């Protein structure tokens, strides 16, 4: 599809060198948008791939208000995807600067330059450990760590701007996965080599979103008239359990799923000790409490609002998405198995 169809639509994507942002930038370009990406290092491999796809690069840091202002200039759409995710060696102030303050810079610049549509990417994590499932957009906030708290603070700025009349839409994704992302690689590898262990009962709810569906949801939030001023959870049609997720991964890598379940309390104690031991040295600990949350925190959400108001329809079921992800890992040389299902 050429530029002629949407030649008047110019979209800035922040976080475009990351997993979700890169997929979104290429999808918008394929739709005919002129796409601009704010990147720290134009010579980096991810930035070069964007440029090869016809995406304009502008150098700058998401924590720099002046750089954001320059990037937003002459844009009709802004998709704010950039964030600092869960790593244990960043200070709380760093999370706040990137996940909260930068949102304010984006909103101010968008207002100053008359941007037509703004999509702010938040997280389902603002709801924390969900007590009643499936949760929805009205479920109480319950952030459980500095990442979730800082993302909630950023979302509050976006909600405030929307109440003041800014053309803002807010998306809260469930866990995003798919080819191009390595966050779930450790899970796939340890399931394949037989070293993965389930801590706890394995019956906690787990909700994912395949990357293509996530991109569809973000674009709908930036184009559909009914999205303005609204918040939408975006995810798969249905959720699973941790045991269900592990079983799908095992099927995709051709092994039997683990049957042993270990108590989670000793793991949490070890994570706490590891975190405190590493922090004075600025080391990212191999085990920390946020990783233990993988086994303990329920994540299950309704996406009915996005389906009803935006026409959002997830297209890639979990089994297909996990299989595609495993195949990509295999092509990258990160998995050893053939992918044939174990007998």
Model-derived regions, located:
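Conserved Rossmann-fold NAD(P)-dependent oxidoreductase catalytic core, especially the SDR/UDP-sugar
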Residues: 104-147, 169
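Flexible, glycine-rich beta-alpha linker
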Residues: 128, 166-185
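Substrate-positioning beta->alpha
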Residues: 149, 153, 181-186, 199-222, ...
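N-terminal Rossmann NAD(P)H-binding glycine-rich loop of SDR-like oxidoreductase domains
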Residues: 11-31
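Active-site Tyr-X1-5-Lys
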Residues: 144-169
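NAD(P)H-binding glycine-rich loop region in Rossmannoid oxidoreductase-like domains
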Residues: 44, 55-101, 109, 124-129
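Mid/C-terminal beta-alpha module of Rossmann-like enzyme folds, strongest
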Residues: 220, 224-287, 303, 319, ...
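Short alpha-helix in the Rossmann-fold core of NAD(P)-dependent oxidoreductases
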Residues: 98-103, 119, 150-151, 207
